Curated annotation (Swiss-Prot):
Protein name as annotated: Olfactory receptor 52E4
Cysteines joined through disulfide linkages: 99-191
InterPro entries assigned: GPCR_Rhodpsn, GPCR_Rhodpsn_7TM, Olfact_rcpt, OR51/52/56-like
Species of provenance: Homo sapiens (Human)
Bilayer disposition of the protein: Multi-pass membrane protein
Location(s), subcellular: Cell membrane
Length: 312
């Protein structure tokens, strides 16, 4: 295989153009993205701090929430700082290795979040359908195994993306009309057939579809259990415990769904719309998740208020 310094096979760097078609608006677009990114950083760091310092929150649900915050921090930080560098300082250049690394982390964190949402749905299923056995089922050992699955499955699925890109010649093509590196965009620059890349990408998407089916199945069982509860107050309490997770799922899958649909079937939609949707997908859910849990989860809300009151 040619070396990574062979500019005919691998370009020494890629140029990320940002959002072609909205070049003159880059500086204005950057400010809302910067604000949302800061909200994501502060919100998720706050969630992690509260869960770490408050012993009463050392429970399965909050361990999974801490994992969600770490994933959201990773997903947003792997994309937005580079985007802001492009918009503010015209730092379009990214090394070939750096581009592959960014691609790996974007797909890794995205995949981890889909698996974690399945795990969180299972957590709510056990909490509502088997409340008396909750602590017996979700032991520390079980939580460790589930966390390993969240990381391990996506490590296995995402690593081949790197080698699928490394096998392709680029013939000097290095202009990426995007704000970050992702598998489909890089493969599209190659001057060789990418059928294997496409097939593998569809296979990975099929895993995500299975995740969605598992989540939906969990909530069908949860709803059946909730409607069998004896009183309306108990049913409302059960719905409330699932509300945060449902909101998080909607925040994650809704922009992903629209991004996928416009990419697959929106050939007449301007390219900058595709890029804007792709960028919203990596920053809006990480910003909204801590807000949702901070507002809807009583234990989190009380501890945040307690911390700020004590500081005052």
């Amino acid at each position: 295989m040619p070396s990574i310094n062979d500019t005919h096979f691998y370009p020494p760097f890629f140029l990320l153009l940002g959002i072609p078609g909205l070049d003159t608006l880059h500086i204005w677009i950057s400010f809302p993205f910067c604000i949302v990114y800061l909200i994501a950083i502060v919100g998720n760091m706050t969630i992690l701090f509260v869960i770490k310092t408050e012993h009463s929150l050392h429970q399965p649900m909050f361990y999974f929430l801490a994992m969600l915050s770490m994933i959201d921090l990773g997903l947003s930080t792997s994309t937005i700082p580079k985007m802001l560098g492009i918009f503010w300082f015209n730092l379009q250049e990214i090394s070939f290795g750096g581009c592959l690394l960014q691609m790996f982390f974007i797909h890794m964190f995205t995949g981890m979040e889909t698996v974690l949402l399945v795990v969180m749905a299972y957590d709510r299923f056990v909490a509502i359908c088997n409340p008396l056995q909750y602590t017996m089922i979700l032991t520390n050992k079980t939580i460790s195994i589930l966390a390993s699955v969240v990381v391990g499955r996506n490590l296995v699925l995402v690593t081949p993306f790197v080698f699928l890109i490394l096998r392709l010649p680029f013939c000097g093509h290095n202009i990426v009309p995007h704000t970050y590196c992702e598998h489909r965009g890089l493969a599209g620059l190659a001057c060789a057939p990418i059928k294997i890349n496409i097939i593998y990408g569809l296979m990975v998407i099929s895993y995500i579809i299975v995740d969605v089916i598992l989540i939906a199945s969990s909530y069908v069982l949860i709803l059946r259990a909730v409607f069998r509860l004896p009183s309306q107050d108990v049913r409302l309490k059960a719905f409330n415990t699932c509300g945060s997770h449902v909101c998080v799922m909607l925040c994650f899958y809704t922009p992903a769904f629209f991004s996928f649909m416009t990419h697959r079937f929106g050939q007449n939609i301007p390219h900058y719309i595709h890029i804007l949707l792709a960028n919203l997908y990596v920053v809006v859910p990480p910003a909204l998740n801590p807000v949702i849990y901070g507002v809807r989860t009583k234990q989190i809300r009380e501890q945040i208020v307690k911390i700020f009151v004590q500081k005052e």
